[in-house]
């Protein structure tokens, strides 16, 4: 908890000392129009989220089939949010709404500030000067309307069912900004640094001032940050808005790096106008660019160094109930896995918490609009063949307004490395020209026309690809495929299908009566796609085809874990092995909006999947990996400094007897994979890889269950969703092993416990799953285990840290 508290404190920034203030209005009441029943709520919030918190739907609305059966008619009528506040005398007052879902009638003390027909649009930021209406005691009322079927609303697409209320509510902070005469409305910092010489940097500032009074005002704009201070005399005419451009030089700047490349150094800048309003922003000094490789793939370059982007896709909670604490835990899990990027397809977040944390922790972010606006069955607007649904007015103007407002909102975040103006398609030429006019005025980062492999007549090729798969593929696919989603280029979204949660979470989301035999809730908690990825059948076939007949619920879950671990790990490892030809990989998804069986590295309850730990092993800074295509052992290193290492290779046969032992010293350099050996062909078994540094300390491990022959994919019939499998890799020898005897011991440690597993038997013990169980029987969420899903050779001992207290620790073995 101390880590979370420290991170949240970082978000507070530097407080402004002058009397003017910016108060966030968080305490509201909410009621359905025509009803006298009122609910106390904390804004930002959706109507459905507030009702969920109030117990309106019951505790289990998201479990089983209950969400499918829920009554949505209560959202047909408007809902009214009301708050009261005091406004200080002698000040000008501005109300700022950062997101409304989807439109609203806004009144202050009975005075209409805006009507629903002028406030449609979830990503518009709106300010209202309310000085003439605000007094000592004020009543603010916001009457929100649900998004119509045809709209540019939040993009939930097919990862989960649509929210019951279509994300209806006050979705961003509402702020009361009180200032004497002049408001410092916006401050933007563009850092300019030569990546070949970090001795100094230019700080190009754009400062927007608004004179809220009806008379001219003269004063001094003051700015302060580490290493710089300045004063600028300014005269503003009555009601004038002025944009100032000012540049300062910082000597010997602290440079912002992603976590794997260095330290994410941050600065704070405070800008004030006399004794009037002040504004603080946080920024980082770094250089970000992108280029197309000789093969036409998008390559991002941070501070002069090419980056292999290793990311996953973010979504908000279906009720938008994320808190600073839950977001902090999730970003910590991203860091724990070794991922260096989060892709936001949709401008997620009720506020900037997730982006602030990415800045602090050195996690890159890719921002862009949702493919929901590119398919008529999601957007509700007519679909054009090439460009989706944003066609003509008022939709193009609304999209440009979205782009403008969100660029301004997010452009000070150093973690943000680029904008994707579309996802599955690209904007039409008229719309993209309007986007670029705004972008070139406000931004400097790489602009990319699409997350898909398209070429714009205006901005050129995207350099990206989006060719799947989204269903299960064998781990060898990532090495063997050279046409679709394999390890080449920049794959903006892909995933080997079901990432099944641990059994405790599965039972929570399905209900015991649905678990076995499999009931319809299994398919309902896959994805909401109408075409594929909506059934558990592919995973059942893969589990049986790979490991053998299913013995029941727990046996299926464990075999599905093993499939997830191997293929998700191999996806990242293959891109590392092919670094240079491979420039980026984004797992679809990082998390889930609701209790799901698909597309996640940790589940809705915050508990890691098997794939989580597969990714954690895949992304050790320097690691030994198995190339499924060539059977080679490869040392990979994306960004770590040059160093000497010692590699140990142990290969045991399918009968758990030693076959091969190899030792090798080598030097690892960034972006230079090293082949260290090769396994014999057509020989199944267990592979243990251990990497030690010059001092003999273990710095990385990897363990594989190797088939004699990889899964055989039907390359001729590959499709956008995936590829048929002609025959599965046979790992049935794992299931035929006698059950191993594993002794578990615990010892207290700071903040948790040390857990030691010892395999006392003469056979391999495959994927032991450690559990930290709370008093209510649920698993502790978050990055609790240093490692998990642990396999042990005969006689092997492993000790791992459990970062949880007051829990029951247990271990699930293979063959439950």
Regions found by a protein language model. Give the residues of each.
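An acidic-aromatic loop/edge-strand motif
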Residues: 28, 54, 63, 67-69, ...
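Short strand-edge motifs at loop-to-beta-strand transitions and within beta-strands
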Residues: 81-83, 124-128, 240-248, 672-675, ...
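Active-site-adjacent substrate/metal-binding segments within catalytic domains
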Residues: 60-84, 91-97, 102-107, 114-117, ...
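Carbohydrate-binding surfaces of carbohydrate-active enzymes
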Residues: 207, 212-214, 519-787, 792-802, ...
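Accessory beta-strand-rich segments of carbohydrate-active enzymes
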Residues: 28-34, 76-183, 212-213, 228, ...
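Extended acidic/polar, glycine-enriched regions
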Residues: 132-137, 206-292
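Substrate-binding/catalytic cleft of secreted carbohydrate-active enzymes
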Residues: 341-533, 563, 567, 572-574, ...
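Extended carbohydrate-recognition surfaces in non-catalytic/accessory domains of CAZymes
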Residues: 19-96, 118, 152-170, 180, ...
């Amino acid at each position: 908890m101390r880590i979370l508290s420290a991170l949240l404190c970082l978000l507070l920034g530097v407080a402004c000392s002058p009397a003017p203030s910016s108060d966030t209005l968080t305490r509201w009441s909410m009621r359905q129009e025509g009803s006298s029943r009122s609910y106390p709520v904390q804004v930002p919030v959706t109507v459905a989220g507030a009702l969920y918190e109030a117990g309106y739907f019951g505790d289990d609305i998201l479990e089983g089939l209950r969400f499918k059966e829920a009554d949505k008619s209560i959202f047909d009528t408007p809902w009214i949010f009301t708050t009261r506040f005091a406004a200080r005398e002698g000040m000008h007052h501005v109300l700022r709404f950062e997101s409304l879902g989807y439109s609203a009638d806004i009144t202050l003390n009975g005075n209409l500030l805006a009507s629903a027909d002028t406030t449609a649009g979830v990503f518009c930021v709106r300010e209202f000067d309310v000085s003439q209406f605000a007094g000592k005691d004020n009543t603010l009322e916001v009457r929100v309307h649900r998004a119509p079927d045809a709209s540019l609303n939040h993009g939930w697409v097919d990862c989960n069912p649509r929210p019951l209320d279509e994300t209806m509510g006050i979705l961003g902070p509402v702020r009361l900004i009180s200032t004497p005469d002049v408001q410092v409305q916006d401050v933007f910092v563009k850092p300019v640094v030569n990546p070949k010489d970090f001795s100094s940097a230019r700080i190009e500032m754009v400062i927007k001032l608004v004179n809220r009074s009806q008379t001219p005002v003269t004063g001094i704009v003051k700015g302060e940050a580490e290493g710089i201070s300045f004063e600028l005399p300014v005269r503003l005419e009555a009601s004038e808005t002025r944009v100032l451009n000012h540049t300062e030089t910082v000597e010997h700047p602290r440079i912002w790096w992603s976590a794997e490349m260095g330290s994410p150094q941050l600065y704070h800048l405070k800008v004030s106008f006399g004794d009037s309003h002040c504004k603080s922003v946080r920024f980082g000094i770094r250089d970000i660019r992108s280029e197309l490789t000789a093969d036409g793939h998008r390559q991002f370059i941070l501070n002069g160094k090419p980056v292999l982007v290793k990311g996953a896709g973010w979504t908000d909670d279906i009720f938008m109930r994320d808190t600073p604490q839950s977001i902090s835990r999730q970003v910590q899990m991203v860091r724990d896995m070794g991922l260096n990027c989060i892709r936001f397809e949709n401008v997620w977040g009720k506020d900037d918490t997730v982006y602030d944390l990415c800045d602090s922790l050195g996690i890159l972010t890719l921002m862009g609009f949702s493919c929901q606006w590119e398919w008529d069955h999601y957007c509700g607007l007519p679909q054009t063949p090439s460009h989706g649904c944003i066609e003509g007015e008022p939709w193009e103007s609304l999209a440009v307004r979205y782009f403008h407002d969100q660029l301004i909102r997010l452009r000070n975040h150093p973690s943000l490395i680029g904008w994707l103006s579309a996802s599955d398609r690209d904007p039409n030429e008229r719309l993209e020209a309007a986007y670029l006019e705004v972008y070139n005025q406000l931004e400097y980062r790489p602009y990319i026309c699409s997350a898909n492999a398209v070429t714009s007549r205006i901005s050129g090729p995207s350099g990206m690809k989006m060719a799947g798969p989204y269903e299960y593929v064998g781990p060898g696919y990532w090495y063997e495929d050279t046409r679709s989603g394999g390890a080449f280029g920049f794959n903006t979204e892909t995933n080997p299908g079901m990432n099944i949660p641990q059994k405790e979470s599965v039972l929570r989301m399905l209900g015991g009566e649905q678990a076995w035999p499999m009931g319809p809730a299994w398919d309902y908690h896959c994805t909401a796609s109408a075409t594929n990825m909506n059934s558990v059948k592919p995973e059942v076939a893969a589990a049986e085809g790979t490991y053998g007949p299913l013995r029941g619920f727990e046996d299926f879950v464990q075999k599905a874990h093993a499939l997830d671990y191997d293929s998700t790990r191999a996806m990242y490892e293959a891109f590392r092995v092919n670094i240079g030809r491979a420039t980026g990989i984004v797992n679809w998804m990082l998390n889930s909006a609701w209790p799901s069986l698909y597309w996640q590295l940790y589940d809705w309850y915050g508990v890691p999947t098997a794939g989580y730990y597969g990714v954690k092993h895949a992304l050790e800074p320097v690691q030994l990996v198995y190339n499924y295509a060539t059977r080679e052992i490869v040392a990979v290193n994306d960004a770590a400094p040059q160093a000497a290492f010692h590699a140990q290779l142990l290969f045991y046969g399918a009968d758990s007897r030693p076959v091969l032992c190899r030792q090798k010293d080598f030097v690892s350099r960034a972006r230079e994979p090293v082949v260290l050996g090769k396994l014999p062909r057509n020989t199944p078994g267990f592979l243990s890889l251990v990497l030690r540094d010059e001092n003999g300390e273990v710095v990385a491990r990897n363990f594989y269950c190797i088939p004699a022959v990889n899964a055989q994919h039907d390359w001729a019939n590959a499709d956008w969703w995936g590829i048929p499998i002609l025959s599965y890799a046979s790992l049935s020898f794992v299931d035929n092993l006698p059950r191993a005897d594993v002794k578990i011991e615990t010892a207290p440690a700071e903040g948790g416990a040390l857990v030691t597993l010892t395999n006392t038997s003469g056979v391999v013990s495959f994927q032991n799953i450690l559990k930290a169980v709370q008093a209510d029987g649920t698993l502790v969420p978050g990055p609790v285990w240093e490692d998990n899903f642990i396999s042990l050779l005969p006689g092997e001992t492993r000790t791992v840290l459990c970062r949880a207290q007051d829990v029951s620790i247990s271990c699930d073995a293979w063959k439950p």
